[in-house]
Amino acid sequence: MSFFSTAVSFLALPFATASYRNDLRRTLLALGADIVLALFVLVGATLVTVLPSLPAFDVVTDYRPKIPLRIYTADGALLGEFGDEHRDFTPIGEIPPVLKEALLAIEDARFYEHSGVDYRGVLRALVADLSGGFRQGASTITMQVARTFFLSREKTVKRKLTEVVLAYRIESALSKDRILELYMNQIYLGQRTHGFASAARTYFNKRLPELTLAEAAMLAGIPQNPAKHNPAVNPLRAKARQELVLKRMLQLGKITQAQHDEAVGQALTIGHRLQFEAHADHVAELVRQELHAQYQGDTYTRGFNVYTTLDKAEQNAAYDAVRRNVLAYDQRHGYRGPEAFVELPDNAEERDEAIERTLARHPGSDNLIAAVVTEVSAKRVRAEPASGDTLEIKGDGLRFAARALQANAKMDLKIRVGSVVRASQDGKGRWSISQMPEVDAAFVAINAEDGAYRALVGGFDFSRNQFNHVTRAWRQPGSSIKPFVYSAALEKGFSPATLMNDAPLSLPGGADGQPWEPRNDDGFDGPISLREALARSKNVIAVRLLQAISPPYARDYLQRFGFDAAKHPANLTMTLGSGSVTPLQMATAYAVFANGGFKVSPRLIEKITDARGNVLWQAPPPPPRQDEQRVIDARNAFIIDSMLREVVSRGTGAQASQRLARSDLAGKTGTTSDAVDGWFAGYAGNVVAVAWMGHDQPKSLGGREFGATLALPIWIDYMRQALSGKPISERKPPPGVSVVDGDWVYDEFKGDDGVKTLDVEVSPLKSIFDAIRKAFGG
């Protein structure tokens, strides 16, 4: 008897004879027995086919999620993250109730009632499918955990049976809260994020406790289909799913009508990627390389947390300073024209596709947005960025590119419909035409006492150029090397008061057999003290000084500061910066003057912890310093410091003291021949910082550009933050120095053993006065 005929017979049962009813009962009993037998056979087949192939169960009982490498500042700001899966493991007790309720409402409302498989849910889903009512998947949270950890998404009977068996095993081994904890930390939620804590940071830049009801509902709607309901990729579908979650929460009594309506109406700002709290891509890459060298493949999955020595506020100040002043330089040297051009089709859909394809090749650079021009006139430009919005640029926002808007502009300069331009927005929401700079820059700051990095910016844009100019760029230092030659001269009896002749100098060794004639930017001044010569960066005096102490001696002396002797020629051009240094070398070298004569080794990592916060490595405290560890005499460091302070107070670095209004700033500008490189290296207190600007392929930065116009503004902008609230640093003279002729000198060089003049004719009258002063002990 078929199932259909049996059903008909059952409906006719009240009208049947007693004999017929007995026959029907026997038939139904037999059918029931067949069903039971079939179920036993099915269960048996399941046990035979599924149980032997069940995967190892410790993956959930001993859960070890893949947690990425994370890098932080010393004050806990996230700098970078490396790993295939973005995940923050969060214990169930720290997950806010609103998020748990939103998730269970849409995924498994009877989670705390069933035993892993919700048969009522299966029937309800079937009825809903047939009736067109609210559709809820038949898979429970526990079944999804089984699928996520053990199985694929293939649609086979065996896979589904295995999922059911695993669900029961999971329920028997783990508590409900533990199962939910596994699910909420493991589930994929789009944008390479796994788990709700990571998704909250990625989409809303928030921690879980900070989520609103609307945001929690948005996240809870993602698991069913992360591609379809990704709010960053499909905002309309994600919104519809969010409203479904809120409707379900209302039906279950988890929220009130007022809460529902408020959440539905809340406008959400959706992020597209993980947001970091400080701009330090080059730092993050340095740390990644160091960790990978030690831990290899485990680097990106074991949840290492690396705390650097950086300060968040100072790092962001350094980043902003580099970006601001590179763009300022670029503005000074004019608009070069659009980055590219694309023909825009008349068809709207084809036009949008053309814009999207084009802008994919021109990614944004922080506040420099790439956009395709859709409308242009001399007074207004409209452009479309990757977001699909329309930017309107007018008034002062067009000034930088005014020549490119003229009707007779050259084709490679002209802005027209289809041009790819860069735009930036000011604090008042006004857009301006800008451009990606060709020049690059770098900045590094360290603690003079222990070498700890305070800030590091390896270049203008890490996504465009991963090369770390701080640690890897060997560039000519220009005049910023001069203080080290002066330091060497102090050991030979010179002092800041030593008079030298700032007059034309002709030496053999020039190009094409011609004499070499070093020059000053500001002409010649005749007899001048070394203090004045350094303050005004006199090239001829620096050459005469090196000539007096000998290039080989000076080159050997430079090694005390950490310079590589092989990269500095043992000839007179060395004093003008013809050798090669990195910005990091310059920072550690200037730290010797700042800390009284000790060489420091730069260090970046303060400590490393595992995912549970256990300390794996901690930087040892710096050992107490001993005088015998000095690389230069304390007196030498003190005197050079006094000279470098004068450079900043009234010399080539005077802009710093004027803008920062401090008397404890010390440093030196540096400009190479033809202004190929611009430098400023200096310090205040225990903060040592070096700024550099130049092209990767060396070429002139411009005829009227110097270290003071290129690098010094970066240094000033950073120091404004780094020195905020810090007292003025005073230096006390160490034992063994005296004031002679109005300036400091080593005690052993107070008399005739010191160098009073060099290449300067002393008048007879001055000789008489000197003799009288000496006779009376002056």
Predicted regions and their residues:
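N-terminal type II signal-anchor transmembrane helix
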Residues: 1-72, 110, 130
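Non-catalytic, structured segments within soluble enzyme domains
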Residues: 43-44, 48, 132-385, 545, ...
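Short active-site loop at a secondary-structure junction
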Residues: 88-93, 403-412, 436-441, 464-484, ...
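Active-site SXXK
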Residues: 103, 249, 318, 378, ...
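Short, well-structured active-site flanking segments
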Residues: 112-122, 194-197, 256-259, 467, ...
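Conserved catalytic neighborhood of penicillin-recognizing serine enzymes
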Residues: 131-155, 206-209, 273-279, 449, ...
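A penicillin-recognizing enzyme superfamily signal
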Residues: 308, 312-315, 319-321, 350-354, ...
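Mid-domain, small-residue-enriched loop/turn segments at the edges of structured enzyme/sensor domains
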Residues: 513-518, 550-588
